[in-house]
Amino acid sequence: MRYFEDIELGEVWDLGERPVDENEIMAFAAHYDPMPCHCDAVAAKESYFGSLTASSWHVNAMAMGLLTNIFKAQGLVSLGSPGINSVRWFVPVRPGDVLSGRSTVMAMRASNSRPMGIVTLRTEIFNQVRSKVAQMDGVGMYGRRPAKAGNNLS
């Protein structure tokens, strides 16, 4: 298990990569962001982007999937998130793109009221040519290392 105390300020996590599939783009859009540029390949050709593009919310969901895989791989004791401070999108994500990313620990502090630490992560997502497609500054809550039994001197 990896606790708040094991995280270091400035630490960078490689999030790995994932391909982006046309069917996945259209399925997500059909349910959550049914704009023609996301769910209709023919109409998308006439859009501002000139082709099918992933919804920005889909990009966020894919980024969260990459990040969550790292939490599991590292055994991080993640307790959820109170929110995202900022989200920016820079370049459209298209079918056939391969997304990769990194998260950097930007700030951290122990909670004054609960047995957890608060960590701000900057997550950057790139396409296969290393163009930044998105950036999120999010806040996460992480479990504190349990006190060892028998250490109570009172």
Give the label of every model feature segment.
Residues 1-83, 145-154:
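Hot-dog-fold acyl-thioester-processing enzymes
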Residues 2-9, 91-154:
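HotDog/MaoC-like acyl-thioester-processing domains
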